[in-house]
Amino acid sequence: MERESGCAAAGETEAAAATAFRDATRQISNERGFENVELGVMGKKKKVPRRVIHFVSGETMEEYSTDEDEVDGLDKKDVLPTVDPTKLTWGPYLWFYMLRAATSTLSVCDFLGEKIASVLGISTPKYQYAIDEYYRMKKEEEEEEEENRMSEEAERQYQQNKLQADSIVQTDQPETVSSSFVNINFEMEEDCEAIKENKQRPVSVPP
């Protein structure tokens, strides 16, 4: 029992010492101008993407704004504060609506002009006709070169065929000449023998 009461008393003295130490540190920090901040796991704020890009393949890409973009946005908000036209006097009120009408008219004219130019084909580059002419001439030159190449190849093929035909005729011609020559000699020899026989045969004279 005494041991248990001693342990309880020791625990109480330790707790009292801890509270006294905590109070002392808090007092010192207050004197120095510090603030006590309780540390804990704070839930991180979920960052919302500025835009989501969808691709044809089905993939998506989220684009987040950087810190510089956020700072620029804050600067723009500071530079261009929202104006309540109901609180303006007549002069600034008319000036405000004149500027708003002018900017909206310019934006509408710009949009319509771009659409009309794209429909009429005015949005083509300034020297597009020269570019088209260059590509047309280049295409004609390529076609002409192709025709020349094909004609040269056909002419070469014709010359080769002609040379082959001439060589075949030259190899066949001497055989025909020699055979005809032999035949002519043979016929001439036969004719000569017939003439000799006629000459050697005695001619009978009638009485």
UniProtKB/Swiss-Prot annotation:
The modification Phosphoserine is found at S65. The keyword Acetylation applies. Residues 142-176 are annotated as: Disordered. InterPro entries: FAM177 (IPR028260). Keywords: Acetylation, Coiled coil, Phosphoprotein. Residues 157-176 have a biased composition (Polar residues). The keyword Acetylation applies. Pfam families: FAM177 (PF14774). The modification Phosphothreonine is found at T66. The modification N-acetylmethionine is found at M1. Residues 131-170 form a coiled coil. Signal peptide: none annotated. Belongs to the FAM177 family. PANTHER family: LP10445P, PROTEIN FAM177A1. This is Protein FAM177A1. The gene is Fam177a1.
